[in-house]
Structure formats: structure tokens, C-alpha cells
Amino acid sequence: MHHLKARAFALLIAGSLIMPEAVLMAHAQVSQSDVQPSFSAIMNAGTRADRVKSITKVPSVGVVRLDVPVVPLMGSDVPSWQEFKIMVQRNYAGVSKLRRALMANPVTRAALAKYRIDPSQIAGAQISSRGSLRLYIFSRWNTRP
């Protein structure tokens, strides 16, 4: 029995060495605490696009999926994914500018490729002073404007 536990642990460690990106990136669904930052990221996408060209390294990428269904909690005001989609449509010029800027910078383009994020999925972003990205995305099947 001890050998089985040791093997499972060894496989877990070996898997993280073979595919480190699977361990480093986490997807999260939008929660109550993400609502305001999500709307802010979408509404300010155009101004945040201007900061992308100065990014020289991306130490981490966090992803918040806007279209993962959530179970509403009592007193929760988490919008539906359709409301986020409407916000993207209203701010489409800024969102498009952000997507183009992320693809124009080779460092951010490589980070998106590493985590298999298609630019058409991106609705908004937060950019830290160190270059870390927190991306607010839609699933591939919800990327149409």
C-alpha cells in the first residue's frame, strides 16, 4: 500500500515537471469579488493596451473565465456571462485595441501561446507593475462579439 501512495506522488511530481504550465496556471470562474475588477478591466481595456508595449517579461498569467456558470448565492450580485458580453460589445474598440497590443508585443504573445489563450477570448486585463497579467476571458465557443 505504501508503494502505491509513493508511485502516485511520484507521478504527480513527474507530471508537473513534464507540463509545468498545467501547474502554474489556474482558471477561475468569476465570483462576487471579481465583478468590479472584471467590469473595470473591460471598460479600461483601451487604456491598458497602452501599457502592454512596455512589458518586457510576464512572470505569471492568471485567468478569470467570465462565462462559467455560477450557482447564485443568497444576496449575490454576480452578473450572467451575457451581461459581460454586452459590456464587451459596448467597449469593443478598447477591447480590440488590447487584443492587438497583446499580440504585437512578442513577450505577451508568447505568454498567451504558452497558456493556449486565443486573443479573441480576451475581454479585459489587469497588468501588474512587474508585468503579470490577469486576463478576463470567454471560452472559445463564446468569443463572437
Task: Describe the residue ranges of each PLM region.
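Short amphipathic alpha-helical surface micro-motifs
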Residues: 42-47, 104-107, 115-120
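Surface-exposed patches in mature extracellular/periplasmic domains of secreted proteins
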Residues: 51-59, 63, 110-114, 120-127
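Solvent-exposed, non-transmembrane amphipathic alpha-helical segments
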Residues: 21, 72-75, 118, 131-132
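Mature extracytoplasmic domains of secretory-pathway proteins
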Residues: 62-114
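Short N-terminal helix-initiation segments at or just after the protein's N-terminus
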Residues: 30-39, 79-85, 140-141
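Amphipathic, charged alpha-helical segments and their helix-to-coil junctions
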Residues: 115-145
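N-terminal leader/targeting segments
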Residues: 2-71
